[in-house]
Amino acid sequence: MYRNQYFKDAECFDCGHKFKTGRSAKSANCPACGAYISLEDVEINMTSTQPIKTRGNVLIRKRGRLSASSVQCRDLECHGIIEANVTCSGDATFRTTGSIIGEIHCQRFVVEKGADVAFLNSVHATDVEVQARLTGTIYSTGPVLIGSNGAINGDVTARSVSIEPGGELNGAMNIVRGKQIALSPPAVPPPVA
């Protein structure tokens, strides 16, 4: 019997088939449709214009700048600048200053302490945590937490919103049931630079 610790989960970008692959694998082929799937982590230290499609993690360093049509990954950690539509199967964490162009779709969305970031397109997440200044529109099918140093300047549509003492919400707050949030506005592609 094989132990679970030697395997990791993977999902095909093309057909959506979920399967297990070796923990140290850098790539895999989907057993259902045969499509190639990258499992490697990507780190951006300088300017890049390549679209990213991996089931690994993406790290954008402080001096990194990503201008691409799309980013598909497991977890995203951004300390630099990103101009792309982002789809994460896990967390999207931001600790940067400046403007982010492109829609963000993820499970957990976090703006860490020290950030001051403006999202020019909407953010769609299951769980949202804001510990710094954020400008933009948030759609969450779960809770939104605004920490004591957190501030959201923009509209929030969520299942629940919690604001710790010292936190701010400057905009409309819509509390709805989870299924209604899926009817948010359609995606608008970012302008090509």
Question: Which functions belong to the PLM regions below?
Answer:
Residues I44-V111, L120-H124:
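Extended interfacial segments that mediate partner engagement and assembly in macromolecular machines
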Residues Q107-G136, G142-V144:
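Long, polar low-complexity repeats
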Residues I82, G98, A115, L134, ...:
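A short beta-strand motif that forms part of the nucleic acid-binding face
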Residues G90, T96, G102-H105, V130, ...:
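Intrinsically disordered, glycine/charged-rich N-terminal periplasmic/extracytoplasmic linker segments
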Residues M1-S67, E77, L120, E129, ...:
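Intrinsically disordered, low-complexity terminal regions
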